[in-house]
Amino acid sequence: MTASQPAGAVDALLLVSFGGPEGPDDVLPFLRNVTAGRDVPRSRLEVVAEQYRMFGGRSPLNDQNRALAEALRAELPGLPVYWGNRNWAPYLTDTVAEMAAAGVRRAACFVTSAFSSYSGCRQYRENLAAALAALPPALAVPELVKLRLFFDHPGFVEPMVDRCVAALAELPEKARTDAHLLFTAHSLPLSQARASGPRGDAYPRQLRAVAEVIAAGVERVTGVRHPVELAYCSRSGPPAVPWLEPDVGDRLVELAGAGAVGAVVVPLGFVSDHMEVAYDLDVLAAQRAAQVGLPVARAGTVGTDPRFVAMVRELVEEVRNPDLPRRALTEFGPWPQSCAAHCCVPPRQSPQHASRAVTDAAATGRRGDAAILMGNDATSTGRRGERR
């Protein structure tokens, strides 16, 4: 750290997200960014592109992130709030360069992904590291501190409880008491799910744990303990590659066949109503339920709920003051601020290779790369802002 930058100081917040097309002309270039390096045929991209075109070729995610950024500016007056994406403008590389040019020294990074996985956590650390590595040599390298995972924070859980209760009220009265709570999240290849977290299988275990906590919260409001289900959506890739199951549409059909009277579909794995919610749940899953006569309602996402926005401020304060108590509602406890080098390593990359990559980055003086990959604070090195 420098003499002018006190320990724990944070002088900006970076909102980090996936990105999405702003209009029809953006759809295919965006999808090419998402699938870069995977040799996905154009015919498959065209199929997915049609889903976006159903909504005017514009992802709802962007406007929702703009709204979240504005809410965060109101919640954190005096702290500049920036926004950067992995796959579309504003790109992280451009935003981090803007921050560095503005003199930002240490920024907290809030990623709109609550759970452990390569694509939902570690890959964002890699994206941040790449953005630092791409900075022009004339710019000092800011320190980027990714905020901890928030899947079991009350600021995420409590709004989801309220949204489940509201969705139950949308069901026909005779279906409300015995309705199932069908929690959903983005499916992952089994190999990636098994590698999630420091000891493996963190992604499905976190989802299950917080689903039970939310269901208990619903019970406190309604007096009814609803059956809890966990299903997945948005599967892609070759059919021969196993992914997390069951599919949400398949599970709705199974529930109807088993005599269920209704279900609330809860988009637990998403913080806003982006395309996976708008298409995979509101169109595909709803169609499957209608085909078998199962009444369903879809719970809302947290969006810009004031409790969720206040949670981000609380996570920033945890970085500013590591001695603050950290709130969490599952047996996982508050997720660590730092991730181990072997956490969420993609199956194609061994833990030894990942650790060596982090070590090599640190040895070359690229402090930002190592800090982001491992999730470390890096202030103890006394090398903040160095670039060699």
UniProtKB/Swiss-Prot annotation:
Instruction: List residues binding Fe-coproporphyrin III.
Output: 59, 124
The source's domain of life comes to Bacteria
Q: Name one GO biological process term.
A: heme biosynthetic process
- SUPFAM superfamilies named in the record: Chelatase (SSF53800)
Q: In which pathway does it act?
A: Porphyrin-containing compound metabolism; protoheme biosynthesis
Signal peptide limits? none
Give me the residues that bind Fe(2+), please: 186, 276
Q: Where is this region: Disordered?
A: 349-369
Statement: the UniProt record of this protein carries the keyword Metal-binding: yes
Q: What does this protein do?
A: Involved in coproporphyrin-dependent heme b biosynthesis. Catalyzes the insertion of ferrous iron into coproporphyrin III to form Fe-coproporphyrin III.
- Stated name of the protein: Coproporphyrin III ferrochelatase
Annotated organism of origin: Frankia alni (strain DSM 45986 / CECT 9034 / ACN14a)
